[in-house]
From Swiss-Prot:
It is found in: Endoplasmic reticulum membrane. This is Probable N-acetylglucosaminyl-phosphatidylinositol de-N-acetylase. Involved in the second step of GPI biosynthesis. De-N-acetylation of N-acetylglucosaminyl-phosphatidylinositol. Keywords: Endoplasmic reticulum, GPI-anchor biosynthesis, Hydrolase, Membrane. One of its GO terms (biological process) is GPI anchor biosynthetic process. Its main location: endoplasmic reticulum. The keyword Transmembrane helix does not apply. It comes from Dictyostelium discoideum.
Amino acid sequence: MKNHLNNNEDNSTLIKKKVLFVIAHPDDECMFFTPTIQHYNFIGSEIFVACLSNGNAVGLGKIREKELIDSCIDMGINQENVFFDQTNNFQDGMNIIWDTDLVEKTILSFIKQTSADIVISFDECGISSHPNHISISNGLKQLMKNKSSSTTTTSTTSSSSSSSSLSNRTTNNLNKEIKAYKLETVNIIRKYIGIADIPLTKLLSYDENSTQTFISTQLFPPSSYSPMTKHKSQFVWFRYLFVFLSRYSFINTLIEIK
């Protein structure tokens, strides 16, 4: 089902964890994160999916919510572990940038709701350069930065300023052991050579202390195909091509957010 390319993987990742995937839209979970979800399913972790937008750009939000739930069930994720933001702060759109502080606050609320040990989402390029993906990356990065800062702050500093940001206040109660990872964006050639990107990944030099790589060895159809079929409103011809040609159907490289 999966292989590890990182032979020096932290032993803590082999222990059952509560893993939270933060995505922007329904179908992100299977288009991009299938190999990682497979890995954590394989080792018996409890998996949660938090979706900030229901993909309502053309009025299909409720349909797409149901599709995400069906896709997650297909991937072995409990329906009760699939969450949507209910604030309407995050509208789906290629020209919409989400507020970083709001994203951070929302991710934090999902972390507390799920008691997650690990949070996984997009990197700063968002795989497809989608601004909603990048907005999540910015919010998660800020959350982890503020968490790190809070560990070095003494209790006396809490009275130094009454105007401290929401970010710095809310991270004080965050589990200090939590880890966050971003899914690496690769160049367009590697993105669309599918399984052929595996040997290239092996050849590339990564920091094995902060990088994990997961591989799905299911080739035809790719393991992302079945859950993607649940997204009937989105499964048009070019997404068929993506599922079969994208390296993200077969391989995920995760980089720890320090």
